[in-house]
Amino acid sequence: MKNLIFIALLCWGGMTAWAQSSEETNKERAGYEQPYHPEEDGDKRISELLKQAKKERKKVLVQIGGNWCIWCLRFNHLVTTNPELKTILDKKYVFYHLNFSPENKNEKAFAKYGNPGAQFGYPAFLMLKAKGEVLFTQKSEDLESGKGYDTKKVKKFLQGRL
């Protein structure tokens, strides 16, 4: 009987901790910009951005994920609010958020470019040449530190030296 009570308390404590963690994540998520657009045709948008990248002599950096993904929102927040990272991003890339969610899995875009998020988790990144060729993929995990991102690692990634 003592074992049953212990197990019940352990389960209750775990559920309470998970609920608090989920609530904290939802509060954090609400404080960030929502850069993903589930209604958008990702393949069509990437085609437009490739033309822009060619004209501007840039690469296309595709961040794959969704507004449901706290790590996706954290990365976007870092690179768009840190002046040094934002400068690199704006100078070298056309930056795009390719949505992956139940509402829109962007299957056509993923059939063309692959979906590294399915292998690595989200966010995942695609670096595209202006001609549409995939230069490389990057998993988010390599850039993370604690509950956020390591600014030095992200800088190296954006500079193409990671």
Which role fits each region the language model picked out?
Residues 1-22:
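Bacterial Sec-dependent N-terminal signal peptides
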Residues 20-40:
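N-proximal helix/coil linker or "cap" segments that precede and/or mark the start of modular domains
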Residues 37-40, 74, 103:
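Short, flexible loop segments at the rims of nucleotide/cofactor-binding pockets, characterized by
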Residues 40-60:
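A short beta-strand-turn-helix
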Residues 47, 51, 70-73, 87, ...:
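Solvent-exposed, polar/charged alpha-helical surfaces in well-ordered, non-transmembrane soluble domains
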Residues 64-80:
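Conserved redox-active cysteine motifs that mediate thiol-disulfide chemistry
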Residues 83-85, 90-154:
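Thioredoxin-like thiol-disulfide oxidoreductase module
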Residues 160-162:
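Short, solvent-exposed mixed-charge patches
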